[in-house]
Amino acid sequence: MTDTNHSSMRQHSLQSLAIAAIGVVFGDIGTSPLYSLKEAFSPAHGIPLTPSAILGVISLLFWAIILVVGIKYVLFVMRADNNGEGGVLALMALSLRPLNPKSRITGLMMALGIFGACMFYGDAVITPAISVMSAVEGLEVATPQLSHLVLPITIVILIALFWIQRHGTATVGKLFGPIMLLWFVTIAALGIYHIARAPMIVSAINPYYAFSFMSEHVLLAYVVLGSVVLVLTGAEALYADMGHFGAKPIRLAAYVLVMPSLVLNYFGQGALLLLDPKAIENPFFLLAPQWAALPLVVLSTVATVIASQAVISGAYSLTSQAIQLGYVPRMKILHTSELAIGQIYVPVVNWLLLFVILCIVIGFKSSDNLAAAYGIAVTATMVITTILAAVVMVKVWNWNKLLVAMIIGVFLVIDLGFFGANLLKVEQGGWLPLGIGALLFFLLMTWYKGRHIVKERTAADGIPLAPFLQGLLAHPPHRVSGTAIYLTGNDTLVPVSLLHNLKHNKVLHERTIFMTFVTRDIPYVKDHERVTVHDAGEGLYIVKAEYGFNETPDVKAVLEEVARQRGMTFELMDTSFFLARETVVPTHLPGMSIWRERVFAWMHQNAAKPTDFFAIPANRVVELGTKIEI
C-alpha cells in the first residue's frame, strides 16, 4: 500500500473520530447558547440593553471561548495526558507520580484532585436539569399555549433518559455524532443570518469593547462574569474525554466546527439584540423564523439529551476510576457493551443522580432560576485543573519555572476571576453544587483515611507470608483435592481467611492461590504486564494482578492468564474462593474522630460485596469474618 493510501486512511479515521467526538465531548458546551446570553442580561444584573453593553458582553463571551477553550484546554491542558487519559483524577495521578508520597504538597494535590472530582458531580446534577429544561422552554416561543407543560415534559424526558441507561447506549450512540453535527451547523446558520442583518456586531471581536464594558460598569460587569462562564460549561469534558477519542480528533473538531459555530451563534444572538432588545426574552429561539421554532425545539431537546448522556457517562467513568484508586467504596459496575470497554453502568450512581436532578427541576422550576446554581462547580474544577497542570509542567515535563509561572499566572487570573464572580451567586443557588461537592469530599476523604487506617491495623497484626509458607510446608496440614483462591489486599501478608480456615478446618487445598489486585496510577496496564505468578512450591502460588484506574478487575481473566502461564486448567465448580469479611469497629484509638469512624463503618458495611464487584459465583465463595478496631 502506498504512503498516499496510508495518509488518506489516517485522515479518514481522524475525521470519523472527530465526528464521533462531536457527539460525546461537545454536547455540554454546544448547548450552552440556549441559556448563556439570556442569563448574562438577566434583569437581576441590571445591565442595560444598549449597543455598547451588548457589544461588551459579546466581546467577553468571544474572548472567554478563545482564551479558556481554544488556548488553555485545547493547546495546553490536553498535553497533560496520563498515558492518553484525561480528566481531573488522571491529572491528579500524573501530578503525584514525581512527588514524595509523605510530603505536604502530595496531600494537597490529592485533596485538590478529589475535590475537583466531587465538584464534577455537583455539575453533573445541574447539566441535565438546566439543559433539558432550557430546550423544552422553547415551547414558550414556538407554541405559548403549551408553556404549562414545560415542567412535566422535562421530568418525563429525564426519567426516560435515566431509565434506558441500564440497557446501554451503544446502538443509539452511533447517531450522536451526526445529530450534534446537524446541531452545530444549524446554530451557525442561525447566527450567520442575523450577523448579516446587523454586521456591526462583528466589531465585538475587538477586546476594546470587553474592557470598555468592564470599566464602565465595574461591579455589575463582575457580576456578569458569573454568567459569561456559562459559555465554558463543558470545557472540562474536552480534557476528560480525551482517552476515548485522542487529542487530535478533539482538537480538529474544536477548531474546525465547534468553536466557529458557537462564536457565530453568540454573535447572531448579539445582532438580534441590537435589532430588537426585547428579544432578550429568549434570544436563542427567537433567532429562528416562526415556522422553524418547533423543529428547533425538537432538535434542541435531542441535543440536550445527548449532552446529558455525556455527563451521565462521565459520572459512571469517574466513579469507576475513584473506586479503583481507593477513594470510593466498591459499587456494582455493569458492562453494557461487549465491544466498548468504556460502556459501563453504575446503578447506585444512576438512581442517585436521577433523584437529585428531579428534586432540582421541581425545586427551581425554570432554567433562569437554575442558571445561578450553574457555573461555580465548573469554575472550581477549572482552577483545580490549572493548579494540577502547573505541577505537571514543572515536576513531570521539567519546563522552565518562569515560563510556567507566566502561562499559569494568566490562566489563574482568568479562572479565579470567573470563580470569584460565581461566589457572588452562592445565595441564589450556588450553594447547591458547593454543598454536594463538600458532602462528597467529606465522604471520599473519610473513606480514603479509613481504608488507610484499616491497612495499617491489618499490617501491624499481620504475619509475613514467605516465612509462614516455609513453616507450613515443613509441617503440612492435611491436603484436600480442589483449588482454593484467597483474595487478599496485601501479597506480603498471610490472608486472614487462610488463618481462619487452618484454625477451624485444619486443611489446605492441593492447589492454593493467593491473589492480590493492585491499581496503578496509569489508565490501562498492558496485557503482558498484567499478571505475575510466583511458584512457592507444593502447589502454592502467589498471583499479583495489576490494573489501571480505568479498568475493572476480572478474576476469571486472571485465572485464564495463570492457566496459560503455568499450563493449568481451572474447573470453576471445583474452585473455592476464600474471602475475609471485615467488620469495622469504631474505637477511641488514634486515627479519626469517633463520629467519622462511624461514618466510615457505615460506608464499609454498605459497600458492594466482593462477589458482586469481582464477578465471582456466589455459590463458590466462603466468607470468614474478622473484626478490625480502628
Curated annotation (Swiss-Prot):
Main subcellular location of this protein, as a coarse class: membrane
Entry's Gene Ontology molecular function annotations: potassium ion transmembrane transporter activity; symporter activity
Entry's Gene Ontology cellular component terms: plasma membrane
The keyword Acetylation appears for this protein: no
Catalysed reaction, written as an equation: K(+)(in) + H(+)(in) = K(+)(out) + H(+)(out)
Membrane topology: Multi-pass membrane protein
Coiled-coil ranges per UniProt: none
A Pfam family that the UniProt record links to this protein: K_trans
Stretches that traverse the bilayer: 17-37, 51-71, 105-125, 144-164, 175-195, 218-238, 255-275, 283-303, 344-364, 374-394, 402-422, 428-448
Keywords of this entry: Cell inner membrane, Cell membrane, Ion transport, Membrane, Potassium, Potassium transport, Symport, Transmembrane, Transmembrane helix, Transport
Superkingdom of this protein's organism: Bacteria
Subcellular location, record wording: Cell inner membrane
Reported function: Transport of potassium into the cell. Likely operates as a K(+):H(+) symporter.
Family: Belongs to the HAK/KUP transporter (TC 2.A.72) family.
Protein name, as recorded: Probable potassium transport system protein Kup
Organism: Burkholderia mallei (strain ATCC 23344)
Gene: kup
